Amino acid sequence: MVTLNNIREAQARLNGIAVRTKLLEPHIHENGEADKRKLFLKPENQQPIGAFKLRGAYNKVASLPPQERQHGVITYSSGNHAQGVAYAARAMGLKCVVVMPDNAPATKREATKALGAEIVVVGPGSKERQLKAEELAAQHGYAIIPPYNDEKIIAGQGTI
């Protein structure tokens, strides 16, 4: 279970990495009258990769003990998480492999490659991506950085 302390630890790891985005409260008017509801926006597109996924990915990679990440990291994602892991790996001087579906947008593949990741393309199924990442991790000793359902990923995202 992720605790507030886990999120604070993640925040410390992300200090100087993730942009501290402002909380915006736009004034909404409907039919000329101020709306009583509150709406808040957090412009996470200001992060270095253009998405909040940097937070969880970086926290997870930075949390790995040196012996677990010595051969590099691998993830399976079709976009923003892939870029977050690639960004974190580059910042830490690690090899990064990303398993992406063949239907991932070319812009996502190119952005991930531009961050230094090696791209492995598989079919469109999410289970197929995960299995390929697990296979490559076992063969090469890569640390798996899952795109979700991981306490370090969740704690990092919680710093938003």
Predicted segments, located by residue:
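PLP-dependent amino-acid enzyme catalytic core
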Residues: M1-I160
